[in-house]
Amino acid sequence: MAHPQIAVFARLADGNAQAVRRIEGQKTMLARTMHSIFYDAVHDEIILPNAFSAAVLTFRGDADGEEAPIRVIQGPKTGLLFTDQLDVDPIHNEIFVPMRNDEGGVIHVFDRGANGDVAPIRKLGGPDSGISGNRVTVDPEHNLLLIDVDGGLGIFNREDSGNVKPMRIITGGPKSGTTRPREAFMVPGTRNFVATTRRYGATPKSQVATSNFQTPAEAESFIGVWSIDDEGDAPPRWTIAHNIFKEVRNLALDPKNKTVMAADKGLNAILTFSFPEAFESATATR
């Protein structure tokens, strides 16, 4: 069982590096596994979900040791169930939490400063939306949401509410040679987003499989760059990190240094790639 903690490392840490600080202990309310974390540089806060307690936790940016969160969204009014993922819009001060309930996939939107047992300010979901309840990415610059939907990555307006269809869907397919984009992460100052994908036609995991992919060749995963204007079977403009990943889980960007960081569960590592092309504002195809 993993030790519940948020470990903070130096940006240039390499190899078997030691964390410079850790948020850990009973008061933190952290769970043994957390699949999403957001650093809000505007307000210097760390926001993440606790799936097991159906909560959203917010910590000070420089929190250390056994420190309690400064805000907790939790309770029956929230409607939260198994809150495994989230994204934050620090410009419009909103938190987006995808999940599944009895009616299917839905996105609950909360005020960023919400605390306690509070109702969401709006909900996005319904049969027409096709929302899976797995992931959501906010694009505050262009007022958009990138959401996992049936058949691909759906593009919605940020303020959409209720049973709304996506404006367009990026599907992957034989033309692009990729599956749908996943783990999307917007590139600031551009219309680009970085995401993970797999080779089109790669063998999917069995629904009953309990093991991870064992080799990079088996996983066939890599990182690509798409545009928010793409639709259908659109190819990525650039790709990197072929034949490296086993179980890539999440991405993060460092715009200042033009690098992409990827967490890999199978490798038990965080990998950093120089990827200056992803930060170009041009939309020419590869």
Predicted segments with their positions:
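A short beta-strand motif characteristic of beta-propeller blades
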Residues: 19-28, 69-77, 119-127, 165-174, ...
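Short loop/turn segments immediately following beta-strands, especially the blade-tip
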Residues: 9-16, 59-66, 109-117, 155-164, ...
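Structural motif
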Residues: 2-7, 54-59, 103-109, 152-156, ...
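Conserved beta-strand positions in repeat-built beta-propeller and related beta-rich domains
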Residues: 1-3, 39-41, 46-54, 88-90, ...
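Blade-level signature of beta-propeller repeat domains, shared across WD40, Kelch, NHL, RCC1
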Residues: 250-286
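An edge-strand/N-cap motif at the start of beta-rich repeat modules
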Residues: 1-21
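Beta-rich, blade/repeat-based domains predominating
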Residues: 26-43, 76-92, 127-143, 173-191, ...
